[in-house]
Amino acid sequence: MRSIWSGILSALLVLGFAAGSWAQNGLERFEKEIKPQFELKKFSYASAEPLGSSGFILNDVVAVVPANPATGDKESTVKIQKVTVEEMDFDRMKKDAKDDETPRFAKLKLEGMTGDDEMFAALQPYGVPNVPVDIALDYRIDPAAKVLTLKTLEVSLRGQAKIVFSLVMDGISDKAGMAGAKDDGKLRTASLTIDDSGLLSKLVPAMAKEQGAKPEEMVQTALVALASFAEGQGPETLKALDAVSSFIADWKAPKGPLTLGLKPAKTAGLSDLDKIMMPNALVTEFGFTASYPGTRAGAAKGGATAAK
């Protein structure tokens, strides 16, 4: 009997040591399975550390993209102050992973991203400085239920504006062949928050100048269009449109973030958009809501006068 238990104990010890040698933290998996796939001229970071069992942190990242048509046939450099990955679907991102399988989840943050590529300077002609960009992403696909939950997609231009988007969609597969998602996907809920702290006051005049118009004229055109849509709408729809109109009218200095929401009575797809012009369908069919701290009652029907 003693020999039997000794054999079992030995086997368990062997398995335990083997499991310990196989176990890898998030940083080790990234450096072994993901990093070698990067087609970059250079990829470095000043320091790195694991984060829990499946995450990692990289500090002062430098990535040099080789010259190619997308970069104007010249090298481009991207720098990121801090990369934080809380979790990532490593199994779907390995080199030998199936091409038709999309990563099922990711939760990460990129803080202080800058670059010398044209993309990072795209807004400079409009008077917007080339400021660091912060990005946060948190999503998960449930393969069995075919549900995509985008908890957060946040893009922030430091000192200029922040946009936060979230949604839940039915009918989304974890297969890469998602071309039919626009037909199969049905929206359950969605939210968009625009927190402007100076971006609109630079973009609107610059865009108006491009069109040979004054900023006020361009804003009034948008408000008149909203006023036209507001005709014949019910109280709940008008309340939401008042928030949107007030935010647009305050483009020089918004009084807080504008938050838009959708929660259809039944899951909605692109084929349902033809209903949007029906009276009150925006609220009754699509569950549209809008909130803005500076909302002025009657702003939607006020049209161009809301900007004065």
Q: Residue spans of the language-model regions?
A:
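Glycine-rich, small/hydroxylated-residue low-complexity segments
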Residues: 17, 21-308
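Bacterial N-terminal signal peptides
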Residues: 9-16
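Bacterial N-terminal signal peptides that target proteins for export
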Residues: 1-8
